[in-house]
Amino acid sequence: MMPTPDRRPDQAPDTTLPAPLSWWADTAHGPDRRDRPLPVDVDVVVVGAGIVGLTAATRLLAQGRSVLVLEARNVAGGVSGHTTAKVTAQHSLIYDRLTSRFGAAVARTYGQAQLRALAWIVDQTVGQSGQGGIDADLVTSDSYVFSSAEEDRGRLAREADAAQEAGMPASYVTQLDLPFPTAGAVRFTGQARFHPRKWLLALAESIEGLGGQIIEGVRVTQVHEGDPMIVESTAGQVRAAEVIIATHYPILDRGLFFTRLEPVRDLVICGIPAPEAAHLRHMYLDLASHHSIRPVGGVYGRPDELIVLGEHYRTGERLDVEERYEALAAWARERLGIKRISHRWSAQDVSTTDGIPFVGRYRPRAQHLWVGTGFGQWGMTGGTAAGLLLSDLIQGTAPDDERELFDPHRFDLRTIPALAHRNSVVAAHLIGDMTRASLNAATKELGPGQAEVCRVGTSLVAAYKDGDEVVHAVSAHCTHLGCVLAFNNAEQSWDCPCHSSRFDIDGAVLNGPAVAPLNQVAPPPAPPRPKRQNNGPPTHLT
């Protein structure tokens, strides 16, 4: 399906940024799966219809299990639909890091899990599997991590060596086809890029074809462990033998994942490059600046566009996100000659302290509750690998080395300083933001597009005035653990700086771990207008 016509790149001035909408969401649409009846019993409930959940559901159905997928929004509407969609086992410089810290065997186990995920995707796509394959615009492509700094050559060479030892198709190169100078790079050959929504929508269709059920618009609020497991949701209860939490950020606090995950956001733009960059056909990551580049198929008969990611920041930080988008657009103009931006969106992810995802039992003694999270911005292969491993764990066929490596409850003394820093940042926000907001009474009348957190009586209110001058007011406390929210002016959302929950201007949950919406409240009273001074009758000059 073609994108909406009013988003054509040539209909906007060079300096205009479009409203946030991912290229993937604009170019692939799925059926409505809302308002469907909830079954009473199934073998497996999968919570979340992103790449982890749909991969696990597909495998479990093929293994003879009955499966229900519950999705709070819509299929591929979360993180998986806002990625750059690099399908690669190259995850920055992870192989040298894993080898140095844990040994070559751990690096090999990690890498082989990513290659297995890559192969599973490629094997099912059109042009690879023959008739009946999924058409997800998959293109075989090389992947590069590069640097423009001469001093980084040693790091890149060590990564290439460690990746080769781990069985990766890696090499160190000094020549790239980028239109700006580089000092060197690590190249992985035989990787891929695809359209994530087309892939996931096709998986969803396949799941239903195999007898599985998918229901959108249903938010899971609680899971009671036992025999059977009881899943509570906004649509009622379901009994299951196994439950997989595949919600990107785990929604149940019992695993204490919120103390061990670092949330981040990146901004993404898409546009037509200058001729000197129009030949780019591979995937590129700048080691120093974290800018990521990949091509994507053109629309409206226009040339291919480039997707550019950058401006890495911690979710909920009090900063001007719109200004960050402008900075990313300026970088793309300078380096790649992108004049017009056709789409922009943001990508959210979480990382673990050791860089290895959490895939396995939700808590140490859990028997039938499972989780996959912490992919550190490499969710296309990392999330697929998690879905494959979760299905193997439930079936009792998981390889021991993968089960141990990705165990969510592994412990490494070397992660303690990072954990302490992570939670000190949360504590600083919890206390400091509360104090700052409590001292902020409503002192100004909001203009259209403006927002503030202010004290009204004994409560903190998050208020936003839209373009029609309607004030939307909600509680300023995140419903997860009560942190004070910050306004994201680019996406008109209230974001939590503690654990990355996000809410729209009327309080609906956009991202977890929060599962409850913000309470809507009365708008703060407008501050009194200053009185005009009466200095007597006006003086007339003659």
Language model features: what each stretch is:
Residues M1-V44, N519-V521, K531:
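Extreme N-terminal leader/targeting segments of oxidoreductases
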Residues P3-T27, L93-T99, D123-A202:
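Flavin (FAD/FMN) cofactor-binding and adjacent substrate-gating region
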Residues A62-H82:
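Glycine-rich FAD pyrophosphate-binding loop
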Residues I269, E452-R529:
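Rieske [2Fe-2S] iron-sulfur-binding domain
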